[in-house]
Amino acid sequence: MRVLHVAPEAYPLAKVGGLADVVGALPKALRPLGVEAHVLLPWHGGLEARRVGEVAFAFFGREERAPLGERVEGGVRFLLLGVEGFGRERVYGYPDDAERYLRFALAAKEVARGYDLVHAHDWTAALLALYAPTVYTIHNLAHQGLVDPGLFFSWTGLPWSLFHMEALEFYGRVNLMKGGIVFARRVTTVSPSYAEEIQTPEFGMGLDGVLRRHAGKLRGILNGLDTEVFDPGKDPYLPAPYTREDPSGKARAKEAFRERTGLRPPVLAYVGRLDYQKGLDLVLKALPRLLEMGFRLYVQGVGDGGLQEAFLRAEEENPEGVRFLPAYDEAMARLAYAGAEAVLVPSRFEPCGLVQMIASRYGTPPVARAVGGLKDTVEDGRGGVLFETYHPEGLLYGVLRLFRLGAEEMGLRAMEKDFSWEGPARAYREVYREALG
């Protein structure tokens, strides 16, 4: 079985969030199961690859051509499409993102002709479901890909007959994610709990009715973790290796983390995108109380400008209690996972989340909100702590409960959990077989 993963990002070539980790790791896990899976990405600025051909495709009623590159990483074949608009620094965040990714998808459908099945990821690849046998994965329902219908049908050449409530229309606009849900043969999302939540008005982002209508082909498959990449026993970013059986090297990581940050323990760490979805408003509101109780806070990430300003200000006002790194720095992220006393994952909603898995693997217990994939991955009271209420008091309660139960012991128990891709890969192979009938 030959499967083409089509996505905007994949580790280690381009990474913004957890989607990249999934797309980079799943093909490796599928290989032993007899699935030959390749990954197709846009040729983002700065990516090096060997040019292997050219792809002709139609856009806005005329033929365009895009160079096709190839690169092998970790045994996975990555294909890069050099369509117009992608020789830039960032993966997302440009005013013409809809046009860029529609152009990419139209070129991708030509590459997909050589495969049995397309596995399309999020709104950027959703258009493929209208052209090829597709499994469509929703990584985050909040980003749906809304496009002006006049532009959409001019760019793609698709018929206006698709612009109705049972197909692409969504409150007067084209919704690419809705198209993926409607036209894909199978739809997955990244945890069982999130698959249930998105069928409700609270979490459905306006698509809960569509998802309920297509519930028969919807399945929640928990993301795995690339346990070769995230392994404290051989992590090159750590000062010393350690395992659950011999955790002595973790003390070296804590010492190095303290030296790099200047924060004395206990340190609570947040590593990830600066986004209100991630519950960072709770962290800011709870911060004065946390500092009063003797905790320190380490925050690392980029994203929302208002949140970035708030954490810069918090560091200025509390130089001994807060450290903020507004950057993507993998070395410091690994050191935080290993060296902090706990990680905070207080999300408003969370499709799956990888931070809590990585931290658990590194023996650092998470304090997480009981939503989505966090419920499916954090064993409350054993490998971490869950809290229900989206309120600063809920977060404070979770932190205090963790340390009352014993954060260090809970971290060691968290290391027992199997987050590998072996089980999820088998589940995806079954979904592929169903999609191909």
Curated annotation (Swiss-Prot):
So which domain of life are we looking at?
A: Bacteria
| GO MF annotations, alphabetized | alpha-1,4-glucan glucosyltransferase (ADP-glucose donor) activity; alpha-1,4-glucan glucosyltransferase (UDP-glucose donor) activity
Looking at its record, which EC class is this enzyme? transferase
Q: In which pathway does it act?
A: Glycan biosynthesis; glycogen biosynthesis
An individual GO BP term: glycogen biosynthetic process
Which EC number(s) does the record attach to this protein? Answer: 2.4.1.21
Q: Which residues bind ADP-alpha-D-glucose per the record?
A: 15
| Catalysed transformations (reactions) | [(1->4)-alpha-D-glucosyl](n) + ADP-alpha-D-glucose = [(1->4)-alpha-D-glucosyl](n+1) + ADP + H(+)
Q: Work out whether the entry's keyword set contains Transcription.
A: no
Keyword terms: Glycogen biosynthesis, Glycosyltransferase, Transferase
Its biological purpose is as follows: Synthesizes alpha-1,4-glucan chains using ADP-glucose.
**PANTHER family recorded:** ALPHA AMYLASE DOMAIN-CONTAINING PROTEIN, GRANULE-BOUND STARCH SYNTHASE 1, CHLOROPLASTIC/AMYLOPLASTIC
**Family stated for the protein in its record:** Belongs to the glycosyltransferase 1 family. Bacterial/plant glycogen synthase subfamily.
Name of protein: Glycogen synthase
Lineage runs: Bacteria, Thermotogati, Deinococcota, Deinococci, Thermales
